[in-house]
């Protein structure tokens, strides 16, 4: 089913320009959104905790910085641009008790709302405005008079403002209307985003890359060649996929590579499909969210162990050497 798509010509920028926006958090995404909004003539303030390392940076870039509670009390639209696992703790203590009927709270990812980490008062709007890319790309594309695709969704209507109109206007102010703003739901955005991260973009890709590298190493091939063939050249293929699609990728590789891809897909396809279905099921039934929130409550033991172990792997050690010339050029 095709999603509704909105462009600049369909959206009233004046809606968000007439409101006071408060952004909680000033990481890469928070900074990019704040800068884009300000350049689109939107009134923006930043909410941070006393002692936050981001306070000086936000002030240096010309933003008024308030405490989170104060920001909530002085804003029409509050964007919670914090890590997913912090939403419950921060919003329950510093945001929800001070919300007034008619205000709108926004999210860049549906995790905390969809998995019931956050329950909002009646009359308070809940919107999703999700740029499809990192904060660095969001800012870079805006400055080039381009934009990223954006997703919007409405979970709860505001008693004063039209939540959809606000979400669309916010997305336009960030440059989303230049590319396209697609309307979905918190559920669909959250589950598809988690699945993409786990099965393909982060988990799946990393697993294939590392297994490919280890397979060649165990078979006696030099680490440098294994790295080039299984890691380094991923960017070339990813760029072709991004700009040309699957068919375009096929047209830009050799017959040998294309035929080899088809032959390799046959034994891998069924196994991958079954594994991916299991991953999706655990996302849909809340098992992944439960595991992740438990990990957070224990202070991330598995993440910390994995991060430490990764530094000692051959793929990282040879990779650091081979990436050095690229990093030096920067």
Swiss-Prot record:
Binding site for NADP(+): 26-29, 52, 54, 135
SUPFAM superfamilies given in the database record: 6-phosphogluconate dehydrogenase C-terminal domain-like, NAD(P)-binding Rossmann-fold domains
Active site: 109
Annotated binding of Mg(2+) 1, by residue: 193, 197
Record domain KARI C-terminal knotted: where: 185-329
GO CC term, one of those recorded: cytosol
GO BP, sorted A to Z: isoleucine biosynthetic process; L-valine biosynthetic process
Organism this protein belongs to: Helicobacter pylori (strain J99 / ATCC 700824)
Name this polypeptide is given: Ketol-acid reductoisomerase (NADP(+))
Needed co-factor(s): Mg(2+)
